[in-house]
Amino acid sequence: MEKMENMLSYGIIFAILLVAELLYFKVADKYNIIDKPNLRSSHTQITLLGGGIIFIFGAILYAAFYGFRYPWFLLGLLMIGAVSFLVDVKTVRPRYRLIVHFAAMLLLFQQWGYLDFRYWWFIAVGIVFCTGVINVYNFMDGINGITGGYSLSVLIPLILLNEESHFIDKNLLIVLTMSVVIFCFFNFRKKRDVLRATWERSR
């Protein structure tokens, strides 16, 4: 019975995410939220931006369906997602982005119980490393499924590993994976959407 209820919840969440992504595309098209390719891009045509916002929708839906179990982590994720989406639609100074990234990393450390300022050097190194990893995604071209494919290659093994050694609520991993699958459905289809900052930095 519980398994059936879980499957029903997953189905509802998947449907909501799909509708949310389609609605976002209409908004992006209406307000001209687009990416014009440059020399670093692997695509050659103007493409809609910001479809990776579905990842943020997924995090919100997880909290709505399964409870606010990881408040600091989710808050940090939303902060990064919000500033990254702003980067898609307007110019944001790098220092402001870094401030948000550092604050989000502090929230992540707080969530997992590592925010102990007696070990400030560990925290400093961790923040710099994690922020660097986040921004590596920024150098991936968000079209043709590159970032989404890499992200699935991380999330799926995490789900399998979590079955053996429970370190996080499996529902969070499953909901986020569904978000990526929906994004990839559009992202692998060229010309429809480009991921860009919202997904890249939130991931």
Question: What are these regions, as identified by a protein language model?
Answer:
Residues E2-R203:
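"…together with the soluble PPM/PP2C metallo-phosphatase catalytic core" -> "…together
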